[in-house]
Amino acid sequence: MWYNCGMKIKVFLAVLACKCCRSLIRLLGRGGTDFPGRVALKICPNLLGELAKGVTTVIVTGTNGKTTTSRMIEQSWTDAGISFFANKSGANLLSGVTAEFAVHSSLTGKCRYTHALIESDEAAFKAISRFVDAKAVVVTNVFRDQLDRYGEVTHTLDNIRIGIENSKNAVLCVNADDSLCASLHDVLPNPVVFFGVDTPIYHDRVEELSDAPYCIRCKHEYVYDYVTYGHLGGYRCPNCGYHRPQPQVHVTKVLRTDDEHSEVIFEENGRQVPASIHLPGGYNIYNACACMAAASVMGIDMELAAKSLSSFACGFGRMEKFRINDADVRMILIKNPAGCNQVLNFLTQRTEPFVFAACLNDRAQDGKDVSWIWDVDFERLMAMEKVLSDIYVSGVRADDMALRFLYAGFPKERIHVQKDYAQLMEEATGKKLPVFVMPTYTAMLALRGTIAKRYGYKEFWQ
């Protein structure tokens, strides 16, 4: 009795403190996505567990595609009439997720929604999952990312595995084309819905270093029937027989990909539906697959889920569009070789002139080790000399980025270093050509803030 009374007081004070902190920070014009949760957890360390009770929760984790997959799922839930909230501001650590639950709950700790859609950082997932009894866990993929923070891919995979071990009641939605992700089925008892793509996406794709070239069981080199990107595709081990499992939700045909969208055919249990995916890029086809798998777990009709893919709003910085100085600007977050090469795959389809900008930071959220840029096939852009008008580099490590482009073969006079974000946008849009900006995470936040203030767009958290 005394414990329950004490816990109720702690919950009340923690939620109150969180709401007050969030409101104050927003009044000051800041994001306030993480700090309010840290304050709340100081008062009540178990706050997330108390607030998440009785809330049907789906968690999305993995290296690439978490935010976009979450936005796709969000649209399908909206169209299906589900009452939910989501951490769409990108606060995906324990403190940020706790803050989202708190601001969507009453002061007594009662959530105002029946469902929650939570994007979780892959390293934070094992902590978040201790407090949230998820109905489903969506694992997008596992790639090498921020070596100083995550270590090698097997370490990231272990973090996800531990998180799923905490999620004993969850159905797993797992990428069948990722040999690392698919291996989770071998070591965990959870039911699994596999998703994947049955065919190559690009006929002329960027050649990449594989993050998982060897069998996770016996260490023999994989043989691929086809590759979609990175180490994803139709893998099989000729030594022990480990191979890509047959996905329940899969793309059977890629009908078309262009600058604006992709058209595909989805199949689930023998039933096929066409879908137009509102964002371009092969990696967004995978994100759409993950969304369709999550919809299956939630009992959402396949046609309704497919239709939602044509109308969802992209996450901030994820193929986000702006109109600046009569030029179309598209911002595409990058953070590792696999994701960056996928952006290059997208760009190499262009036949019209454009301006390219890369903004490289080395803060904790970006990864302090920026050596990964040397594993990206920027040389591929040289083949686009006729349509690539100018290259701009910016950010804390702009000089490193400029050096990388020099080694890729671009003449020095074509590489413009501009560390001031406002001036960068003015110069890059000066020719009125389409501009494609590739920033790392903290560069994206800073650049996004500059665009909001200077050109009248909303802040990322609004």
Q: Each predicted region: which residue ranges?
A:
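Adenine nucleotide phosphate-binding catalytic loops in nucleotide-utilizing enzymes
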Residues: 3, 193-337
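Conserved active-site and cofactor/substrate-binding residues in soluble primary-metabolism enzymes
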Residues: 34, 55, 68, 92, ...
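Residue-level signal for inorganic ion chemistry
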Residues: 140, 173, 287, 291, ...
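Fold-independent oxyanion-binding glycine-rich loops
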Residues: 63, 88-89, 119-121, 141-142, ...
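Phosphate-binding loop of NTP-binding sites
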Residues: 2-196, 204-214
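Short glycine-/acidic-enriched loop or helix-start segments at secondary-structure transitions
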Residues: 70, 126-128, 148-149, 182-185, ...
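Buried hydrophobic packing segments
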Residues: 73, 77, 97-101, 288-298, ...
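ATP-dependent carboxylate-amine ligase
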Residues: 2-26, 31-33, 219, 232-234, ...
